[in-house]
UniProtKB/Swiss-Prot annotation:
UniProt-recorded name of the protein: Protein MSS51, mitochondrial
Superkingdom: Eukaryota
Membrane topology label: Peripheral membrane protein
Function per UniProt: Has a dual role in the assembly of cytochrome oxidase subunit 1 (COX1). It has a regulative function on COX1 synthesis, acting as a translational activator specific for the COX1 mRNA, and it also binds to newly synthesized COX1 protein. Together with COX14, may act as a chaperone that binds efficiently unassembled COX1 and prevents it from unproductive aggregation. When bound to COX1, MSS51 is unable to interact with the COX1 mRNA and translation is halted.
Length: 436
């Protein structure tokens, strides 16, 4: 699946919103009449009246080519330039009145597209539309005010987003707009945390996706993550930060530190180094471009969390032994939407990079935009390196995938969610055989 990624658009808007304190934008009226009405509503157990600023599908819907947002009008123009009508194969010149997104060459082609109407694809496209307009609405975003350290007497529930938010004391997510905004950002750190956590929602085969080899890898990592439960853990190991390698990093490398801190809060006894690796991992907002660095760029969030950016391919650092020695108790790898099977990125992943990954013998987890996207990736790895790898986790729906719908500007009817499916594998370990 080929997705056009533009960090200067919606992603940059997210980072702008995340860096602003939501409480600085909340304006509270203290008029006596409002206090009195609030008291009456509370006494009667009534819900407060909706605010005109509250997002709804009605007040967030605008056709993109008539949008009050300049960048959405530009995006509509980009779709018309890049995409083709699924019915006629011609340029797209017609905006679907149900979704507000340019989708077909003409109204006649739109009416003829039986698959589009039968599948109600326009309903998902409408969600794409209203979510994007909500981000640009100027409303307060109190949902971006994330909680701090969890008390040791409080357990985190990782069954789903709702229970995670509740047990971590997040701002109450009452609308789909709030969920979409927050889950897109938190999907990366919480996907990692949900796999490594002792209360992970993923269980062992046959009831769950985790294989026996996967259980071994996760048990090794959890042995390190919970040192107080493993008194025999060597002091030298406890003093070393756990390394999380994210290969092919792009959007996840741009997340602010306080977003990634939500991962560290799940493991208060452990410090982390997050290594963002790849030619597009370092983005300079002032220059509006990706930059290269011949040396690692280090950013320390606090004493428990550090980012390291390396703007080359993983095999370069692997061959130079920059990360040696690897430790399956202390190191884990993630690739978010790598596109192993995609024609555009197949060559950069399935050669030296994949060989180097498998040589580490550490756990590798990967996500996909949808089930087919991830299944194609895993099947390709199996077909080329099947004898050199163990499957750790069968492809499964990611409990902590983003709930925000996105669309591909090159094919506006191709919709997806970030990190929708997840799977895992590792280079095969060979057990020592004692010879007689």
């Amino acid at each position: 699946m080929t997705v056009l990624y533009a960090p200067s658009g919606a992603t940059q808007l997210y980072f702008h919103l995340l860096r602003k304190s939501p409480h600085n934008r909340l304006v509270v009226s203290h008029q006596t009449r409002r206090h009195l009405m609030g008291f009456v509503r509370n006494a009667l157990g009534l819900d407060p009246p909706p605010s005109p600023e509250d997002p709804t599908p009605e007040n967030r819907f605008h056709p993109w080519d008539q949008s009050p947002s300049v960048d959405l009008r530009e995006r509509a123009a980009k779709i018309r330039t890049l995409a083709h009508c699924p019915v006629t194969g011609k340029d797209i010149n017609y905006t679907c009145p149900l979704s507000g997104i340019p989708t077909h060459h003409s109204r006649e082609a739109w009416e003829m597209d039986k698959a589009y109407h039968d599948s109600k694809k326009y309903e998902i496209l409408k969600k794409v539309n209203i979510y994007e307009h909500d981000l640009r609405s100027g409303r307060p975003f109190p949902e971006f005010d994330f909680p701090q350290q969890q008390g040791y007497d409080k357990a985190v529930n990782l069954t789903n987003w709702d229970l995670f938010f509740y047990t971590r004391s997040f701002y109450s997510m009452d609308t789909e707009f709030q969920l979409a905004a927050v889950t897109k950002m938190l999907s990366y750190p919480i996907t990692i945390g949900s796999l490594l956590h002792k209360f992970s929602p993923y269980s062992l085969n046959p009831k769950g996706p985790i294989t026996l080899e996967g259980l071994k890898s996760l048990a090794a990592l959890r042995y390190t993550l919970y040192p107080l439960e493993n008194r025999s853990l060597p002091t030298t190991t406890k003093n070393r930060a756990m390394r999380i390698f994210i290969l092919g990093a792009r959007a996840e490398a741009q997340l602010p530190g306080h977003v990634w801190k939500q991962l560290q809060f799940l493991f208060p006894e452990q410090s982390f180094e997050i290594h963002f690796i790849g030619p597009e991992c370092l983005y300079k907002r002032d220059k509006q471009e990706y930059v290269k660095s011949t040396t690692p760029v280090v950013q320390r969030v606090d004493e428990t969390l550090k980012f390291i950016y390396r703007t080359n391919f993983f095999e370069v650092f692997h061959e130079a032994q920059d990360f040696f020695p690897y430790d399956p108790y202390m190191d884990v790898f993630f690739t978010f939407h790598p596109g192993y099977a995609s024609p555009e990125s197949h060559g950069s992943w399935m050669g030296e990079t994949m060989k180097a990954l498998l040589e580490t013998k550490c756990a590798i987890f990967t996500t996909g935009f949808n089930k087919k996207d991830l299944t194609d990736d895993i099947n390709l790895v199996k077909s080329k390196y099947g004898k050199e790898m163990d499957v750790l986790m069968e492809p499964v729906r990611n409990v902590f995938g983003s709930t925000k719908w996105e669309l591909n500007d090159m094919n506006p009817q191709e919709v997806y969610q970030f990190n929708m499916y997840i799977a895992g594998f590792r280079g095969k370990r060979y057990h020592t055989i004692k010879r007689q």
